[in-house]
């Protein structure tokens, strides 16, 4: 029997080391077939990478993180080349270990008290008018990191009074009331929390999370701020069916959510959950039509769509695929 991994504070555990800590064994094995990517999943890289390197340098200089890099997002080159990024606060080490996600797991460091001001200054220097702030899960904090979110929102608005802020929050497991008390007092312009997939596969895809809890988080925020849009996103290709995705869309509408993103899951490494199917652009179009018919005001559905992909355009209702 192999010795258990000793988790050291501040150390990032990724790939095989991270997956070894998941009690539900669902990761890919050598014998499992890896599906070949269809033509529509091929990524075109920009010819000039100077803008990309500039954003990376600004992040490093200020000790900030982007979920684009930490989660190995396939849209990194496109978004960075257009001067946009999704900032990830509260460090780059997550207390969860979801087998679809490339963000490192471990025992995180104490939050950086200067991060809100550094974030606000970086956003000002980049000249952004719309920003998405997300975070790792911080189950080690009594409020799940909610106060840090609020501090970041306040600092950003002080430095950038005309900016719009979208927050992509964790589920605040066991801390919802306290977290919402804080966030409803300092609300963003868009409140986003991803369900990720369908309830049937939650035990494998989101160990430690609860489908009903996530729906309740979205509903409770909406009840506190009926005027602020709530948003959620799902990945396809993890064993669900299109019919199950549509059922989740109905659940989201019943809980007051009006903005939706649907995108294709891509396996970050051979140690992560395998892709079980590739959904065609036509199928995404069909699901978008279903979403609009249900009453979603915004629905970004396509192979490369991610929760924060062109979030500024999503918020304006401009079609994103």
Swiss-Prot record:
Annotated EC: 2.8.1.8
Main localization, broad class: cytoplasm
Reaction catalysis annotation: [[Fe-S] cluster scaffold protein carrying a second [4Fe-4S](2+) cluster] + N(6)-octanoyl-L-lysyl-[protein] + 2 oxidized [2Fe-2S]-[ferredoxin] + 2 S-adenosyl-L-methionine + 4 H(+) = [[Fe-S] cluster scaffold protein] + N(6)-[(R)-dihydrolipoyl]-L-lysyl-[protein] + 4 Fe(3+) + 2 hydrogen sulfide + 2 5'-deoxyadenosine + 2 L-methionine + 2 reduced [2Fe-2S]-[ferredoxin]
Domain of life (superkingdom): Bacteria
Domain Radical SAM core intervals: 80-297
Keyword list, A-Z: 4Fe-4S, Cytoplasm, Iron, Iron-sulfur, Metal-binding, S-adenosyl-L-methionine, Transferase
GO MF assignments: 4 iron, 4 sulfur cluster binding; lipoate synthase activity; metal ion binding
Top-level EC class as recorded in UniProt: transferase
Pathway in which this enzyme or protein is active: Protein modification; protein lipoylation via endogenous pathway; protein N(6)-(lipoyl)lysine from octanoyl-[acyl-carrier-protein]: step 2/2
Name of one Pfam family that matches: LIAS_N
Name of the molecule in the record: Lipoyl synthase
Organism: Pectobacterium carotovorum subsp. carotovorum (strain PC1)
């Amino acid at each position: 029997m192999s010795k258990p991994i000793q988790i050291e504070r501040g150390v990032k555990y990724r790939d095989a080391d991270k997956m070894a800590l998941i009690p539900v064994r669902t990761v890919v094995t050598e014998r499992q077939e890896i599906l070949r990517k269809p033509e529509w999943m091929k990524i075109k890289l920009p010819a000039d990478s100077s803008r990309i390197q500039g954003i990376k340098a600004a992040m490093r200089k200020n000790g900030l993180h982007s979920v684009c890099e930490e989660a190995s997002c396939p849209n990194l080159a496109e978004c960075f080349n257009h001067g946009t990024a999704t900032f990830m606060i509260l460090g780059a080490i997550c207390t969860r270990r979801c087998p679809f996600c490339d963000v490192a797991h471990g025992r995180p460091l104490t939050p950086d008290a200067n991060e809100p001001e550094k974030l606000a200054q970086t956003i000002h220097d980049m000249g952004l008018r719309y920003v998405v702030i997300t975070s790792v899960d911080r189950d080690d904090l009594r409020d799940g990191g909610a106060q840090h979110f609020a501090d970041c929102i306040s600092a950003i608005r002080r430095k950038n009074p005309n900016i719009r802020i979208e927050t992509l929050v964790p589920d605040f497991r066991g801390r919802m009331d306290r977290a919402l008390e804080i966030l409803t007092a300092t609300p963003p312009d868009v409140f986003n929390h991803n369900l990720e997939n369908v309830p049937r596969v939650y035990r494998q895809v989101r160990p430690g999370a609860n489908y009903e809890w996530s729906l309740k988080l979205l509903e409770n925020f909406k009840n506190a701020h009926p005027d602020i849009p709530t948003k959620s996103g799902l990945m396809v290709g993890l064993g669900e069916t299109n019919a199950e995705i549509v059922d989740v869309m109905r659940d989201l509408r019943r809980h007051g959510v009006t903005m939706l993103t649907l995108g294709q899951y891509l396996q970050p490494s051979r140690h992560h959950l395998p892709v079980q199917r590739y959904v065609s652009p036509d199928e995404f179009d069909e699901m978008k039509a279903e979403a609009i018919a249900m009453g979603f005001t915004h629905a970004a559905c396509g192979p490369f769509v991610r929760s924060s992909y062109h979030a500024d355009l999503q918020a304006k209702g401009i079609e994103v695929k």
